[in-house]
């Protein structure tokens, strides 16, 4: 739950540069700056007559259409603050030229490395920016300010590398950031229109916020403000394609906006140094925000600490197509204090893998929240509460959960759902462990949803393990949702009339070519095999590739639960060897609806073993294994394949 302190003004920066500026020609021109070969007495209009210093650039009032290009490989210390504004048809562009590394700017402890004040129609591109002088203070990498400027337009910040901004970690609206676009209080109601923050890398070592857009024109009852109403949101804000990592506090935070879009961003590591309430990607005091196609992970706190957050002062925020994982605080928070507003939020078609503390947190008297068609997974040993509802000046008033898949191999308790005044829970799947407080659901499924390979996600575009296998009971058994967004996480159509699937996947059931995941052990890790006693993966004695499964002595085993179709015949093929011919090792299958099957291998070189089995009428899983029943010898296994019969030919070599 985040409350921004809106106090203070930036120290008057005008004094830093004096009061004398030079105006260049009215005709658009390109100016070159070379830190090693330039001279401020040059004209600056050719690479052979480049300027040299920031002092020269900062003394010029540039005209619409001008370009200021800094030589790659060059470096400058201090603040870059060129003057002037462009027009809608002719913005002023800061960029680079030449070859080599991006031009490097070090603010050296000033409040900004690159700064614009009451300026519009600017584009800042392809720079490397730091702000570090060995001591922390309130500072930013790129800082754009509107103070009594009315509506300022077209601020584009594109393709920059901002890192090592050694700001303090105080959480307030005027605090430190990698990239900050800010509207300050004044006598003229002011905002920004057409802001694009695109393709930047922010981090590592940025304190405290990665990307922040905020305003002192924030006051309205929705944000629990009882003062003079002055909310004046920025419009046409797009924050996309940015990579934010190792930030002291929050990752990406659009505040006081209307219709902002936050998409295709990655936040890797937030709240690394702050110790305050923070989240990965969240919006505040903003209407009609869309947050989609993002990934947030490695959040380092349970003070909030979710990958994503619909914070208070909001209406109609949509959170969709995002991937959250390994965040200490959880996946998703929807929150408001008692007299504020958070209404009509939608959370849909997202995937959460091993998020901590609270997968979902509902805090305060939020209203009309819809959470549907999400897939949530917890692996063994996790203790997160699947849903956690608590008071913040009142308990949640109304929330609905539909068509979600909770695949819980372990979990904490479901907390506080009896406090939600109007709580609807329908057509959800809860599979695995069933802990205290689990909500009633007249159309609940507790059957295995048959995810292709849960727990295998490695990135936003690498989560196919959360699709549904053919025969899944989650296929076509969801609830129709009006205005459902029209597509799932992978872009499959979601009909307005046909029943949807449960979970984030709405495509047809998947028939994998080999249900045995990591059958060749080439991930270098045991998962999703489960070892018992002395089982491990080693980079020696592999039949093919680099890695093999090893059992040292007996009894010991490695097992894997695979997804299968009912009433279907399969063959399991694998290769094994033992270091002592008198001590067999078994390749086998069990728990498939029939009698356990195995073949014994006693050879001291890799020998192929095959077993055939037919699943039961209701069986959707089977357990394959490599088992050494006794002895002291070491056994190895590799290249396990499960296929529908007819089995692979004898001369086939599995990949």
Where in this protein do the model-derived segments appear?
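Extracellular beta-strand/beta-solenoid scaffold signature
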Residues: 81, 107-115, 135-148, 170-195, ...
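Right-handed parallel beta-helix/beta-spiral solenoid domain characteristic of secreted/periplasmic
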Residues: 67-69, 75, 85-137, 164-172, ...
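Surface-exposed loop/turn segments connecting beta-strands in extracellular beta-rich domains
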Residues: 78-79, 127, 131-133, 137, ...
